[in-house]
């Protein structure tokens, strides 16, 4: 059996920088969460076609791992035969609709595992470019940096050298639909975009930035949109917590 861990991420900050061709561009600090991850295992057996277990509630063709498999079929022509003798089993720990990148992380880790088992015929850059066709966050998980500045549509991933923070996460029993949160932002908040307000943030270490700004609304442009889209979030006592991605997870630095 072959296994790989697919780690969650948080967004230390997330700022929308524009809107092009129907998609929002951004600047964000992604930080890997080392103690929260899904585990993907390739289990030997005999199967008629690609088989995926452990992702309940998501139809196969909509699953990010399956999309990654499809994206890899051309550069890995023997992959279809390989998955007639192996199935994919996912042990899920990352909650969905939580702003932690679980589906994207699964796709990125799966791609890294397949590339590694094939003696890495694709460069990490090439693998990340393939990943960008699956989802905006996938390239970050392909590179698997502990911390990185992510720009554009998510395809520009620049490692940021810093000591990773020890984080405490709080994920309420509230799912935030990423597409709806972005739609709310676009409709009501895009006009408030001000790149000067976050000038130089990408050069600051995450701990300093969280201490200096200390305001989840200022740090994450999607937070107000998430509050509007998921009003149950407003009923939570989240003083001292920051907001990751489109939600619904909050995080803070451990004492």
Curated annotation (Swiss-Prot):
Keywords: ATP-binding, Isoprene biosynthesis, Kinase, Nucleotide-binding, Transferase. Its EC number is 2.7.1.148. Coiled coil: none annotated. Pfam families: GHMP_kinases_N. It catalyses: 4-CDP-2-C-methyl-D-erythritol + ATP = 4-CDP-2-C-methyl-D-erythritol 2-phosphate + ADP + H(+). Belongs to the GHMP kinase family. IspE subfamily. This is 4-diphosphocytidyl-2-C-methyl-D-erythritol kinase. The gene is ispE.
């Amino acid at each position: 059996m072959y296994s790989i861990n697919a780690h969650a991420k948080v967004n230390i900050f997330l700022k929308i920088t524009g809107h092009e061709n129907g998609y929002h561009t951004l600047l964000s600090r992604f930080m890997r969460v080392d103690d929260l991850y899904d585990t993907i295992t390739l289990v030997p057996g005999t199967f008629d076609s690609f088989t995926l277990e452990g992702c309940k509630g998501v139809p196969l063709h909509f699953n990010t791992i399956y999309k990654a498999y499809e994206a890899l079929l051309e550069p890995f022509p023997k992959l279809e035969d390989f998955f007639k003798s192996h199935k994919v089993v996912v042990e899920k720990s990352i909650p969905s609709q939580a702003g932690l990148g679980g589906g994207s992380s699964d796709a990125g880790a799966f791609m890294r595992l397949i590339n590694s088992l094939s003696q890495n015929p694709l460069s990490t850059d090439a693998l990340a470019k393939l990943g960008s066709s699956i989802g905006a966050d996938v390239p970050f998980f392909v590179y698997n940096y502990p911390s990185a500045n992510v720009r554009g549509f998510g395809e520009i991933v620049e490692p940021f050298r810093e000591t990773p923070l020890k984080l405490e996460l709080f994920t309420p029993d509230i799912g935030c639909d990423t597409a709806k949160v972005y739609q709310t932002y676009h409709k009501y908040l895009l006009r408030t975009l001000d790149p000067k307000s976050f000038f130089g943030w990408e050069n600051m270490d995450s701990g300093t930035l969280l201490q200096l700004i200390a305001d989840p609304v200022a740090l994450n442009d999607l937070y107000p949109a998430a509050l509007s889209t998921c009003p149950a979030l407003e009923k939570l006592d989240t003083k001292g917590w920051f907001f990751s991605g489109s939600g619904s997870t909050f995080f803070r630095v451990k004492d």
